[in-house]
Amino acid sequence: MILRNFSFGLIVCLLAAHPVAAQVAPALPSRQELQPGQTLAPALAPRDPSGLFEQLPGGPCPFLGSDLSFTLRTVDLSGLPLEWEGIASEAWAARIGQSISVAELCTIRDDVARLLLARNLLARVEIPEQKIADGTVRLEVVPGRFEEVRVTGSAPATALVRKTLEPVTEAEHIDLNVIQRYLLLAADIPGVVLVPTIRAGSTRGGLVLEVAVDRKPVTLSLGGQNFNSRTQGRISGIARLSIDGLTGHGDRTTLLASTSADFRELQVYQIGQEYRIGAEGLTARGSFTYAIGRPGDVLAPLDLRSRSLVGNIELAYPLVRHRRRNLSLVGGLDLVDQRTRVFQTLPFSREHARIAYVRASGNVSSRYGDDPASLSASIELRQGLDILGAAEQGSFDLTRPFADPQATVVRANLGARYSPARNVSFIANGFAQYTSSALVTYEQMGIGNLSIGRGYDPNAAPGDRGAALALEVEFGPIVRTQGIVAPFVFFDAVRVTNLGPRGYSDTLRSVGGGLRGNIMNRLDFGLTYAHPLDPAFPGGPRADDRVLVTLSATFL
């Protein structure tokens, strides 16, 4: 306690002598700074099998060239499952009572198959041999079903792919909502590359799903960016190595290292592991992060040393898995230990937090008229727990003595994209956080270059609660032989509130524009000019303009 008070008093004296440093809190690394992998380009999405299912051909039209015609009175559709009856009448409703050629029966036949496919039922529609005497036409629906799934390949996860696809053969007819789920779950297995093909089976309406399994066992990503503050090292680099499918149980091992350019201000090391449990997509994940920091620039005279240990375990389950809509549920536990020392040895702060959380997240893509649109959202409930040595509210060694390590926090994210024209897209992303308590450093709402608030240093204005919104207009993408590029302009706005005895609110806004793109499907880049409109802290000068650069390349 005496050392803590001595350290705090010494820091106050030194900061008072340096007005710029006084505005830079000797805080621990934020949550965003301890997750540098987010600055790398996301992994390539699994192959979308949307083109796999096409309308089953009804066969050649036997009436082409015929001059025969008749008055259509009704259509008798047989072979359709009960739950699908009545949805195909649109194919012939406009022709009832009209004189049509017999060749138009093939058009009706194909339209019925198209309507069924739009309702996710894959079926073949046939015109059986018949005599049309009273204007009644008989059509027969032969619902497709998978007789067999053939999985080939030597990848360790081949057995897991086969087990994941087993439910495909259990359905009486092919419901694309069900089939897509299992194909996408199989494609989600780490390190697996699937090439599915549909072939005719040996029975009427029977199909065979052939899946060739290839393996991509190792992925290496290297990247760099200049998003950080001067105290944490403006420029940093990151390397991430993913090793997939070592055991055949849908496993992925991830090794990550990040460091400031001079290997001094902040270094982060992380190891992660995930496994599939069963064949329905349930995934167990765990990770451990070790970070050491030695802030420089105006904080260098304090010789601050920080150490962060973050452990995480979680379970994730895909409630809905579809190429156009997804919903997942995640539950987990964060174990956070962070400490700061001044002059290398004098204790200044120590924070031990144990946070349980549950999160629901989803996305949907569709069309608004003829224009593509997408929406994503998540909501998360986090609860600090008094277990495993967690700090208590009022502990003298917390960075914020009035913070509550057992606080309840609600977080929400929302994203939307709408493209009303071929080369123009409107993009909105936002997040909000609410709590009634002052929070420990790790739980605070971080804003800045690593989230929303481009042009401001990461964690420039941490908050206990608040909201942030990023609006963009993207032009393009402009496609060339060697790559693509998309110019954009943006407006960011953040409002944060800090609770506690010295609580305050702050608003940060910025505008700017830039380019993002990809070269040769390997190098992702981003270049952004950001012009802050507000001071980084109340009463201070307006933050300086920033040119932000990010690069990431994927190998192997």
Tell me the role of every PLM-derived stretch.
Residues G205, G233-G237, E265-Y269, R307-G311, ...:
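Residues that define the transmembrane beta-barrel architecture of outer-membrane proteins
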Residues L241, L515-G517, A543-L556:
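Outer-membrane beta-barrel "beta-signal"
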Residues D188, R215-L222, T247-T254, T289-D297, ...:
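Flexible, solvent-exposed coil segments and beta strand-coil junctions
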Residues V218-L220, T247-T253, A279-R285, H322-L327, ...:
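Repeated loop/turn-to-beta-strand initiation elements of outer-membrane beta-barrel proteins
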Residues I2, Q23-N228, R240, S258-Q267, ...:
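Periplasmic polypeptide-binding modules associated with outer-membrane biogenesis and secretion
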Residues R339-V485, V489-L499, P535-P541, V549-T554:
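C-terminal outer-membrane beta-barrel translocator/porin domains of Gram-negative envelope proteins
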Residues V218-N228, A239, G250-A261, Y269-I271, ...:
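Transmembrane beta-strand segments that form the barrel wall of outer-membrane beta-barrel proteins
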Residues R264-Y368:
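Transmembrane beta-barrel wall of Gram-negative outer-membrane proteins
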